[in-house]
Amino acid sequence: MLEYQVKIDSFEGPLDLLLHLINRLEIDIYDIPVAKITEQYLLYVHTMRELELDVASEYLVMAATLLSIKSRMLLPKQEEELFDEDLLEEEEDPREELIGKLIEYRKYKDAAQELKEREEERQNAFTKPPSDLSEFAKESEAKDTNLHVTVYDMLGAFQKVLNRKKITKPAPSRITRQEIPIEDKMNEIMNHLRKTKKRTNFMTLFQHDQKEHLVVTFLAVLELMKSHQIMLEQEGNFEDIYIIGSETIHDA
């Protein structure tokens, strides 16, 4: 397998990934089910490695931290400690430090989002009104579409792609190694969107079975999203992700 050493700025760090999982799974941040969140976290890190992204060491440190917390919570208590109120009062929740960091990070992220929205409001005050997108918006609003699809949402969708390929296709006896330019895949996706002139299901882009093609397709979508050539939408947690070309939106 060829190595695509690509660092994606959209990955903001392990706390950001944990917050995404907490929101996606509708978990109480003050009572995190460590076993469940650890399993999901490790799955995302594994997917990043499948994509051969430049996974920062801090993600691996957090993985080790989660496994440590999980182990501490699974350790059997001494029988005498179960009836010793003083020991119970002194005992700390292994999750306490992590929960504190998550709460602080969420405050920081919310504040950053508020500042960003204020800046956008100021910019809009001195620009011409946007084009009328009411026709395009009707369908999206009716479905309560979420237009803020994150990179982690895309990783979750890519996990489904990998699982589906493993289930429906036998493992190849021989893998043909070939270099696939990301630019070619980006052009292929944009040409498809221009031809259809409608939104495309993210999953349908992954027609090939070779890992090289799957990885490059995912990276091509990321690059198109970063360069604002496409927009992604999702109708809710665990729902399919759809891709819309920016040209389609502007022509609506």
Swiss-Prot record:
Job description of the protein: Participates in chromosomal partition during cell division. May act via the formation of a condensin-like complex containing Smc and ScpB that pull DNA away from mid-cell into both cell halves.
NCBIfam families, A to Z: PRK00104.1-3 (NF000994), PRK00104.1-4 (NF000995)
InterPro entries recorded: ScpA, ScpA-like_C
Subunit structure: Component of a cohesin-like complex composed of ScpA, ScpB and the Smc homodimer, in which ScpA and ScpB bind to the head domain of Smc. The presence of the three proteins is required for the association of the complex with DNA.
Protein family membership: Belongs to the ScpA family.
One Pfam family in the UniProt entry: SMC_ScpA
Cellular-component GO terms for this entry: cytoplasm
Signal peptide bounds: none
GO biological process: cell division; chromosome segregation; DNA replication
HAMAP family per the UniProt record, alphabetical: ScpA (MF_01805)
Organism this protein belongs to: Bacillus pumilus (strain SAFR-032)
Major subcellular location class: cytoplasm
Region (Disordered): 117-136
Matching Gene3D superfamilies: 6.10.250.2410, Structural maintenance of chromosome 1. Chain E
Designated name of the protein: Segregation and condensation protein A
Keywords from the named record: Cell cycle, Cell division, Chromosome partition, Cytoplasm
Subcellular location: Cytoplasm
Residue pairs linked by disulfide bridges in the UniProt entry: none
